[in-house]
Amino acid sequence: MISWELILALAVYNFIMYATPGPNNSILTASGIKFGFIRSIPNILGIPTGHGLQLALVCLGLGSLFIKYPILFDVLRYVGSAYILYLAYKMFGSLNISKTEDRSRPLNYYEAILFQFVNPKAWVICSTAVTLYYPKNENILVGTLFMVVMSTIVNIPSISIWAYGGSIIRQYLVMRS
């Protein structure tokens, strides 16, 4: 049986990890500024979907590969960092809030899912959460489902704040221009 103490501890951990600055929240803030909250919703929904898949893989044993072959995490870190720099260039380089025609678009649902697999912070969140909060005496499927559901429930409101904050900044910038 999963205790209320474990549920509360995992919820607090998830909130702290998802609500603090990182690649996802930077992209969501930029998306909120550039495109507004509504157009950022596919990105907001793709992040917990991708992170849930990633977390399930770690719960089901992928994390042991990182322990056995630490170079995999180094490769992931460099590839992820390069991709994050590319996205930063793309997003922040195009933060023009003009009323003229603009072909840029926010990350879509599938791009947000895939981004989780090159996001170093997301891998750290998964590895740490499974190490500290995985319910030890549960069936592997029940434990994995618990971790993924808890992650998703906390993730969506925690990251939505960043896109909403970006949309507030957008309103201010539009008023000033």
Regions found by a protein language model. Name each.
Residues 116-126:
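Selected transmembrane alpha-helices and immediately adjacent juxtamembrane segments
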Residues 17, 115, 154-155:
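Hydrophobic transmembrane alpha-helices of secondary-active solute transporters
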Residues 67-96, 154-162, 170-177:
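Selective transmembrane alpha-helices of multi-pass membrane proteins
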Residues 2-71, 128-147, 163:
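Juxtamembrane transmembrane-helix termini in multi-pass membrane transport proteins
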Residues 22, 36, 119-120, 175-176:
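Short loop-to-helix capping motifs
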